[in-house]
């Protein structure tokens, strides 16, 4: 991983015309630059305020897929302007099939659909140099934030890593940190940015809207939001190259507490010795690290005896 950073530091001294890229992330000579993982959610995308933008049944979904795709492309363009090389994108919202993959350059790979052992961070490993989170949102215990939730608004009311309440930004940053990869940038609303900085420190954040409530915000236009993301991604990669951002590390072994909306999941999970039922709605389990913690969380959230095919 650090070898790529050393090479990228050399590349950043080469004129941009020699290592340039396009907004579509088209093939270039930048593959020796820092390797970047982009996890893309949807709730934090510019203009998103309700479910009408977030899934195939929403009347605005088709249009907002364009905006989500545009924000990821803007992040790629900014990262490449700073010397980034290989990029892997994780389509991490809903059905995992939101991004318009024909808009991306041939040198960008995209993780799609489910299930995935590492969920929103599938494919990350210690070969990556930095991670960028696009379209993220605040956590379920935050009274502020557009569409604030953690993992599942339908089934979960809290997830805790050791002794603190987590959200998707923090959880996924901890997964990245498990492999020594720092999160260098998060985009979303102002509540998301505040949560990220409170736990991850002085990372780059791109605020594209300001929350009034769960379903209301003052928002930038898509073009303006993409411009902010492009500029922030470029700055984030330059700071990565300068060694200014460290991985987010959690104490291991890690204790995970999962709180459900209803009582029966905790009751049934407690039949297994690895889960301790701590009250009517919550279970706790221990894991060696965040990779194991995530695999276990994926299981307890998704397993059903009637899963098909």
What is each stretch, according to the model?
Residues 1-9:
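Bacterial N-terminal signal peptides that target proteins for export
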Residues 8-19:
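Bacterial N-terminal signal peptides
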Residues 31-51:
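Mature N-terminal segment immediately following signal peptide/propeptide cleavage
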Residues 54-74:
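Short catalytic helix/loop segments, enriched in acidic residues and glycine
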Residues 106-124:
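A glycine-rich helix N-cap at a beta->alpha junction
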Residues 153-179, 188-191:
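Active-site glycine-rich loop that binds ribose-phosphate moieties when present
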Residues 175-183, 187-237:
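Active-site rim beta-loop-alpha module in soluble metabolic enzymes
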Residues 225-309:
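C-terminal accessory domains and tails appended to enzymatic cores
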């Amino acid at each position: 991983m650090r070898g790529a950073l050393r090479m990228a530091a050399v590349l950043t001294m080469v004129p941009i015309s020699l290592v340039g890229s396009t907004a579509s992330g088209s093939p270039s000579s930048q593959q020796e630059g820092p390797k970047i993982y982009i996890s893309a959610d949807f709730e934090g995308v510019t203009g998103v305020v309700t479910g009408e933008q977030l899934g195939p049944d929403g009347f605005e979904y088709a249009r907002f897929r364009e905006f989500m795709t545009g924000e990821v492309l803007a992040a790629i363009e900014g990262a490449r302007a700073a010397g980034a090389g290989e990029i892997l994108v994780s389509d991490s919202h809903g059905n995992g099939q939101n991004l318009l993959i024909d808009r991306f350059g041939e040198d960008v790979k995209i993780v799609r659909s489910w299930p995935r052992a590492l969920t929103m961070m599938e494919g990350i490993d210690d070969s990556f140099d930095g991670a960028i989170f696009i379209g993220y949102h605040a956590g379920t215990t935050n009274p502020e934030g557009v569409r604030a939730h953690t993992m599942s608004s339908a089934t979960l009311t809290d997830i805790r890593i050791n002794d603190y309440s987590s959200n998707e930004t923090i959880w996924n940053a901890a997964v990245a940190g498990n492999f020594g990869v720092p999160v260098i940038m998060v985009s979303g609303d102002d509540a998301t940015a505040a949560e990220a900085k409170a736990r991850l420190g002085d990372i780059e954040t791109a605020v594209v809207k300001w929350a009034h409530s769960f379903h209301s915000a003052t928002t930038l236009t898509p073009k303006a939001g993409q411009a902010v993301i492009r500029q922030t991604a470029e700055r984030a990669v330059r700071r990565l190259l300068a060694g200014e951002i460290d991985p987010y590390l959690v104490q291991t072994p890690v204790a995970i507490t999962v709180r459900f909306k209803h009582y029966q999941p905790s009751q049934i999970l407690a039949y297994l010795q690895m889960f301790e039922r701590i009250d009517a709605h919550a279970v706790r389990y221990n894991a060696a690290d965040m990779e194991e913690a995530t695999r276990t969380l994926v299981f307890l959230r998704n397993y059903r005896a009637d899963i098909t095919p």
